[in-house]
Amino acid sequence: MSLTKQYFKYVSQNIFGLLGTSCYILADTYFISQASGTSGVALLNLCLPIYNFIFAIGSMLGLGAATRYAILRAQGDERSERYFSNALLWALVFALPFMLAGIFCPEVLLRFMGGDAEIVALGVGYARIFLLFTPFFMCNYIVSAFVRNDGDPSLAMVATLCGSLFNVVFDYIFMFPMGLGLPGAALATAVSPVLSIAICSRHFFKKSSTVRFVRQLPSPKLLAQSCQLGVSGFVGEMSSGVTTTVFNLLLLRLAGNVAVAAYGVVANYALVATAIFNGVAQGAQPLVSRCYGKNDAAGARKLLLLGSGTALALAAALYAVLFGFTGPIVAVFNSENSALMAQYAFSGVRIYFLGYFFAGFNIVAAGYLGAVDRPAEASATSLSRGIVAIVACSLVLSALFGMNGVWAAFPASEAITACLTLFLLKRKKR
């Protein structure tokens, strides 16, 4: 199979898989909006940064270790087999604080994220359940990354889609027929990665599998080597959490809970958009790492060009749909028919999503830099878009233009980051 055909196979399957992952957040938002109105949407939006942090750690461990595994395997290095076990063991270590927070102080965490008394009372049960399942969220990222890098992207896609379908169906069953309310939504979300892991585990029993669990203690050295390549994935996932937290605080100050609920609509569709572009980056990663391990620089550059072109085309298609159907798209999560929320979300969608013309390229380029063992440059791109530029732009533009400035901060920060990314890519070629 040609490199181009392999690229489209890996990328398309990974996009579908990650879309499935984002769909269970959308399912939560829809059913919670039906059950609890704008307060429920505001609660979920306050919880999104916690999800992002959990996924960011899973991404750093999973993508970092799997990328290191793919490079070493292409070079015929037997040390590659130790990275899978090490990543799983460290996931359990990193998950422990989240589990303890879920057991002893979920209300403290919700207050820290900006929740008022109403939101905290509404969300304690929801937060407690999903925090207790943190190890499964993290391990799901690791298992799927290794299955994909071991040549089975189809199984990784099927596992993710099955987990997401379970979540959507049981969100409804747990919340309404069984009457569990918001804790039911959390339970459906929490169990879905367990199912995904179980399906992915079939790969490890195949004769073709080169990934296996090795009995060992957690190795800080292997962790550092993995995180070196996974830190861009960590920052990339965290960027959504940082953006959400900063925007929530600014919007609470500007217009209160209704504005946060409006941003909840924008943020949930942004999860889907980001999943699409992460699908391009993560789908190409095994192929780029393989080319790099075999010293095939031309093949790696070809994959970068394919990824960048794909990202631009997808950004144009995405914005055309969102611009053409903004009203109905906003109405999906506006069960109380709040005119003010609809007004805020309408302008938010149309301004915010302009940023994906730049964000798609930035995500693909950061994934490429990590896949070819250029972690410092990958981290610079991810840190710019995830923390430095977005925080600076949101503070400055919100002070100048109010709520529209908050929405415009995302496209402005991504445009700045795209300039930095182009500089980093060209500098290496000289």
Predicted segments, located by residue:
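Membrane-helix interface/capping residues of multi-pass secondary transporters
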Residues: 29, 38-41, 153, 182, ...
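Short alpha-helical transmembrane segments in multi-pass integral membrane proteins
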Residues: 1-15, 69-133, 177-231, 288-355, ...
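Small-residue-rich hydrophobic transmembrane alpha-helices
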Residues: 41-100, 137-156, 262-326, 359-378
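Structural signal for membrane-spanning alpha-helices in multi-pass inner-membrane proteins
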Residues: 29, 102, 145, 171, ...
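Short runs within selected transmembrane alpha-helices of multi-pass transporters and secretion channels
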Residues: 62, 129-148, 156-167, 185-200, ...
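Transmembrane helix-bundle signature of multi-pass secondary active exporters and lipid flippases
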Residues: 14-63, 67, 133-137, 224-290, ...
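Helix-loop interface residues and adjacent transmembrane-helix termini in multi-pass membrane transporters
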Residues: 26, 35-38, 72, 149-150, ...
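Hydrophobic transmembrane alpha-helices of multi-pass small-molecule transporters
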Residues: 53-56, 167-171, 197-201, 271-275, ...
